[in-house]
Amino acid sequence: MSYADSNGIAFYYDEHGEGAPLVLLHGGIGSGQMFASLAPALANRRRVIAIDLQGHGRTADVDRPFDVAAMADDVAGVIEQPGGTVDLLVYSLGGKVALRLALQHPERVNDLILVSIAIKRSGNHAEAIAAMDAMTPAAAEFIKPSPPGQFYAANAPQPEAWETLIAKTSDAIKHDYDWTDEVRGLRPRTLLVFADADSVRPAHIVEFYGLLGGGLADAGWDGSNQPANRLAIMPGRTHYDILDSALLAPVVEAFLLR
């Protein structure tokens, strides 16, 4: 097992392959195990590093809320050790952390692949917001039989902290946020990836891509007006299974090879 220290926390990370580092950040209550089907495909060309965030997976929790700005600083400290500057492929909560990382520490990030993330809370469908609001500490026992719950019980250094994980996640996802103005100045070259039945509203996807210079004009017959940033939609997928799409790895590889 591999660990890297940052801000007083020992962060677990799983590593596959060789080459330029590609860091993966998972979604809420999950772990790097969320990328189990994707990481081996990406490791054919890259050194893939899946980090377990604070209080998730094999990384122990500390007396601190799940604040994405602080978690971004954590990741900045971790990636100083594998090479300093990395590409990032990130999902859901991990996407929020990575977006803050790219805004707070732009010198650490080359390319950024954001999977199923809204840049403001209202960018999610009403049903998704209602589901976030329904995730309370009282739901911990109900969620425990889920794959993330089973993985946590078997692998977490403090499996008895499951209710704390749910409570902190519950608090974090209820906070309103709007990063629209900051995203306009996002520096890393960025690929946005969404499912065609995502928890993020289609109108918000268009808005997000537009803030990155995408979809504002025709690219021209020769593609000379094509934006540097990209948008991909995974067909037949949802927010909850998008990482299992067979199309995701080739889309990511094509973007990184540009």
Where is each model-derived feature located?
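Conserved HGGG/HGGXW glycine-rich cap/lid loop of the alpha/beta-hydrolase fold
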Residues: 9-60
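Conserved alpha/beta-hydrolase "acid-adjacent" motif
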Residues: 199-207, 216
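Short beta-strand/loop motif that positions the catalytic acidic residue
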Residues: 186, 192-194
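Catalytic histidine-centered segment of alpha/beta-hydrolase-like enzymes
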Residues: 232-246
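Active-site loop/oxyanion-hole signature of alpha/beta-hydrolase fold enzymes
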Residues: 37, 49-89
